[in-house]
Amino acid sequence: MAKFKAFLKRKDVEVSLKRYGIDALGAMAQGLFCTLLVGTILDTLGTQLGIGFLASPIVEINDVGYTIGKFASAMVGPAMAVAIGYALHAPAMVLFSLIPVGYATNVMGGAGGPLAVYVVTVVAAECGKIVSKETKIDILVTPIVTVLIGIGLAYFIASPIGKGAMAVGDVIKWATTQQPFVMGVLVSVIVGIALTLPISSAAICAALSLTGLAGGAALAGCCANMVGFAVISFRENGWGGVVSQGLGTSMLQMGNIVRNPRIWIPAIAASAITGPVATCVFKLEMNGAAVSSGMGTCGLVGPIGVWTGWANPSAEALLDGAQAIIPSAADWLGLALISIVLPAILAWLFGRLCRKLGWIKDGDLKLN
């Protein structure tokens, strides 16, 4: 046993909460941010501001047009895998071999793609590190072992992880059948949590065709998490944190959440309030694309989805009886309050309370 421990130490294989639960998760969120979320932001800028080189496809592959943003988004699996490998101190050959592992796993994982990539990449990277430079044909052995173990493991567990993520969708589907106040609380809290976890809230909302009042509640929960974390972590992260979390993803805080789960209280508490306010007070409906219900303020996709749904309801919304409307001042006020103003104020208040109680300490929300 002593020799085995010494071998693992020599290979820098450290089985610890910090290495796997904080470093790897935090790095994975950065990989997701640099691809899927930056791609989403670029597409949104191109479409809404009429920036030709961002809005127009730059090439067609198999009759599918790809914009710059779409290319960036397509690389989310490889980017997450490489980021995780980097956090695990994987040597170069292992790191490069994780690119196909991440791509395959994310595709097979569906709504649970990010979580599947995390689990599979950790195993593949550590196995690759163990065999790295142990043979005279390392240039063959290391990538073959990493790719075979990674994609082989993904074949068996990525799809079940995706189905497990969709089980969250079953809970959301049940919540949508409740009366508006209860539905607002449940959908907002659950979808907001899903947004921050390493699963795809957008994919879940799309699969459930979540539009109407339920879509509005989902939007409220996502915005509460993104804006909430951006505001309460301003002390530690400044304006860079506001942009990366408020327009990017609250998943960047996953490593810190593992370290101190209580930092999630302000955002969740805010979502429990903004959800029913959206459904009962403002009757806020997401009648744009269902996927927008799970995007929050990422590239402002969520609020823009509500706006486009007013004038041109999506096919999913039309099936639920949605109609085009001319938004009133109350509609615009509700959208602004639910998406940005209320989450910011409520999370700040709950954040101050948590800091006074000693539940959140300086540095707990610091992003690397």
Locate predicted features.
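Pore-lining transmembrane helices
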Residues: M1-N368
